[in-house]
């Protein structure tokens, strides 16, 4: 990037920063007054003319100032060198708040609420997906000699409990055998593979009488549980923040709210997040959704060093504090992964 290009990018960066802060179109005089650009107002005007001709900024009809375009925001984000770091106190507060969650649901609810507060945007967190979750442990408990409680725990912290009604009573020795058979079939397997293994058990041993009948009944109930988890789930928080920024969306606020409620677009964008620690910024039309025009989405994946559990991020207007939002999304994702991975 040549010196003139570098100077124009500094002008663009100043326009983005001021417009995000003030929501008012930016003129050359205010840029010279607020920023140490080292050039005259006339030079800044010339640079703004070039930026406008190249599509990075535009002039609203009602103002003599300029505002960034989607292309301008994209250039600004692509040229970001330093993402605003969170303070050590902020990081400790995030970690402590998430660690206080009692289970997977509570941790994710806390995460979505926290992210909405940090960014003042709509926060979205995808529940751990079926394809990536692994069965960590299966426990089988006899409530009565003919009634069992099965508890499935995944590596992401998901806990599912099911009751199994047996046709015949089983003794403690048979209960231990049942626990071993089911544990060997499930533990350490991805949920998708576990459902296949359980289906095989049900077909091989179901109806064989005695222990075989108990295995078949338990496997059938487990299969129902595993199949139910195929549905993608999304947590939303801070939707009221959209109305606070209603002016940024023109007349499209209703369609944005509908897209968030339907979840399909957001889940599609989050599904593309395959690498924990890498933050993706989609601006305006980059979301590839007419319903989401006028919005930006900052997202990443969360999980452990070896497993991605799901995606998370924020949705807000293109007039967004990108450095601060990127830092917040990255930090919350990191601590969600740490908290869930330690359980």
Swiss-Prot record:
Fetch the InterPro entries from UniProt: GAF-like_dom_sf (IPR029016), HrcA (IPR002571), HrcA_C (IPR021153), WH-like_DNA-bd_sf (IPR036388), WH_DNA-bd_sf (IPR036390), WHTH_transcript_rep_HrcA_IDD (IPR023120)
Q: Residue span of the signal peptide, if any? A: none
Q: Which UniProt keywords apply?
A: Repressor, Stress response, Transcription, Transcription regulation
* The UniProt record lists the keyword Disulfide bond: no
Q: Which GO terms describe its molecular function?
A: DNA binding
User: What are the GO BP annotations of this UniProt entry?
Assistant: negative regulation of DNA-templated transcription
Q: Does the keyword Transcription regulation apply?
A: yes
Looking at the record's lineage, which domain of life comes first?
Bacteria
A Pfam family matched by this chain, by name?
Answer: HrcA
Job description of the protein? Negative regulator of class I heat shock genes (grpE-dnaK-dnaJ and groELS operons). Prevents heat-shock induction of these operons.
Return the similarity comment.
Belongs to the HrcA family.
Cite the HAMAP family for this sequence: HrcA
Q: Which PANTHER family match?
A: HEAT-INDUCIBLE TRANSCRIPTION REPRESSOR HRCA
Protein name listed in UniProt:
Heat-inducible transcription repressor HrcA
**Species per Swiss-Prot/TrEMBL record:** Mycobacterium bovis (strain BCG / Pasteur 1173P2)
What gene is it encoded by? hrcA
């Amino acid at each position: 990037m040549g010196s003139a290009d570098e100077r124009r990018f500094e002008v663009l960066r100043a326009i983005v920063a001021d417009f995000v802060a003030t929501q008012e179109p930016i003129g050359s005089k205010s840029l010279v007054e607020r920023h140490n650009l080292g050039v005259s107002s006339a030079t800044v005007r010339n640079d703004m003319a070039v930026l406008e001709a190249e599509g990075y900024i535009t002039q609203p009809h009602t103002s003599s100032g300029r505002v960034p375009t989607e292309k301008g925001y994209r250039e600004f984000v692509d040229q970001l060198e330093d993402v605003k770091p969170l303070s050590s106190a902020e990081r400790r507060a995030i970690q402590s708040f998430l660690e206080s969650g009692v289970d997977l649901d509570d941790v994710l609810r806390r995460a979505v609420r926290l992210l909405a507060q940090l960014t003042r945007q709509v926060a979205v967190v995808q529940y751990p997906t079926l394809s990536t979750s692994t069965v960590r442990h299966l426990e089988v408990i006899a409530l009565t000699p003919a009634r069992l409680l099965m508890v499935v725990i995944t590596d992401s912290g998901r806990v599912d409990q099911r009751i199994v009604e047996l046709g015949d009573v089983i003794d403690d020795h048979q209960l231990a055998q049942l626990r071993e058979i089911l544990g060997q079939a499930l533990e350490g397997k991805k949920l998708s593979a576990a459902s296949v293994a359980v289906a095989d058990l049900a077909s091989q041993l179901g109806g064989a009488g005695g222990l075989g009948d108990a295995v078949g009944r338990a496997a059938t109930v487990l299969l129902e549980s595993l199949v139910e988890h195929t549905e993608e789930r999304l947590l939303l928080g801070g939707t009221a923040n959209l109305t606070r920024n209603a002016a940024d969306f023109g007349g499209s606020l209703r369609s944005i709210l509908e897209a968030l409620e339907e979840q399909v677009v957001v889940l599609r964008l989050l599904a593309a997040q395959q690498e924990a620690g890498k933050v993706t910024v989609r601006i305006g039309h980059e979301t590839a959704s007419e319903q989401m025009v006028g919005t930006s989405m900052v997202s990443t994946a969360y999980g452990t060093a070896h497993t991605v559990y799901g995606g998370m991020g924020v949705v807000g207007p293109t007039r967004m504090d990108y450095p601060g939002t990127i830092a917040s999304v990255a930090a919350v994702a990191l601590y969600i992964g740490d908290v869930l991975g330690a359980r």
